[in-house]
């Protein structure tokens, strides 16, 4: 069977030689050029409409520099700058749990550079984690088309290693070992809450 563009149909194959993740669906769709932010946005919309979770992207803080008032009842912003976010990208509620996470992409094939993370964001994640929030990083390796959930509890040691000038990145092998693979699928595109379910179970045992 051929598609309208003339290309033959073929079943999807695994991205690599890894065994199937317990969170995998039967179909892997891949990123297909979309950014991680768009994939998360689509997934969060699906969760909201399905009554599964309420998770939103936090607005980026803006510093207004110059405002013009052409009319007394109207203001026009002429100049403004995006400020460095003081917390993480996303937060919300899922099944009674507070969810808080940062999402990052990298073109690097072998590691995730930690200079992509700000110290005040890590401090926020630490404080939220100690209040029993579910805190993690979602990392996409663009060239590998792989997405992982890395819990804050696992990330913390790599951050300490970074600030102690021991190593400036987390290898993809370390992330695969300590994180949860999030496969692409149809709906939602990134069903990351299945990985969150596993994280909740694992951390409930660790925190006892």
From Swiss-Prot:
Catalysed reactions, semicolon-separated: Endonucleolytic cleavage at a junction such as a reciprocal single-stranded crossover between two homologous DNA duplexes (Holliday junction)
InterPro entries to which the protein is assigned, alphabetical: Resolv_RecU, Restrct_endonuc-II-like, tRNA_endonuc-like_dom_sf
Molecular-function GO terms, alphabetical: endonuclease activity; magnesium ion binding; nucleic acid binding
CDD domains tied to this protein: RecU-like
SUPFAM superfamilies: Restriction endonuclease-like (SSF52980)
Chain positions covered by the region annotation Disordered: 1-28
The organism's place on the tree of life at top rank: Bacteria
Keyword Cytoplasm: yes
NCBIfam families, per the entry: PRK02234.1-2 (NF002581), PRK02234.1-4 (NF002583), PRK02234.1-5 (NF002584), recU (TIGR00648)
Described purpose of this protein according to its UniProt entry: Endonuclease that resolves Holliday junction intermediates in genetic recombination. Cleaves mobile four-strand junctions by introducing symmetrical nicks in paired strands. Promotes annealing of linear ssDNA with homologous dsDNA. Required for DNA repair, homologous recombination and chromosome segregation.
Protein name, as recorded: Holliday junction resolvase RecU
Organism: Staphylococcus epidermidis (strain ATCC 35984 / DSM 28319 / BCRC 17069 / CCUG 31568 / BM 3577 / RP62A)
Species lineage: Bacteria, Bacillati, Bacillota, Bacilli, Bacillales
Gene (name only): recU
């Amino acid at each position: 069977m051929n598609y309208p563009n003339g290309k033959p149909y073929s079943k999807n194959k695994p991205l690599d030689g890894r065994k199937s993740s317990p969170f995998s669906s039967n179909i892997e769709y891949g990123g297909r050029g979309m950014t991680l932010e768009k994939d998360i946005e689509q997934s969060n919309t699906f969760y909201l409409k399905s009554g599964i979770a309420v998770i939103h992207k936090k607005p980026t803080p803006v510093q207004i520099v110059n405002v013009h008032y052409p009319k007394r009842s109207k203001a026009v912003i002429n100049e403004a700058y995006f400020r460095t976010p003081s917390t993480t990208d996303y937060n919300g509620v899922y099944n009674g749990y507070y969810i808080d996470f940062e999402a990052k992409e990298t073109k690097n094939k072998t590691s995730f550079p930690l200079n992509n993370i700000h110290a005040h964001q890590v401090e926020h994640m630490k404080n939220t984690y100690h209040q029993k929030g579910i805190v993690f990083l979602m990392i996409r390796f663009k060239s590998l088309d792989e997405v992982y959930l890395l819990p804050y509890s696992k990330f913390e040691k790599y951050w300490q290693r970074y600030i102690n000038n021991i190593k400036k990145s987390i290898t993809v092998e370390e992330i695969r070992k300590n994180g949860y693979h999030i496969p692409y699928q149809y709906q939602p595109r990134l069903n990351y809450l299945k990985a969150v379910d596993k994280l909740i179970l694992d951390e409930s045992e660790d925190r006892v």
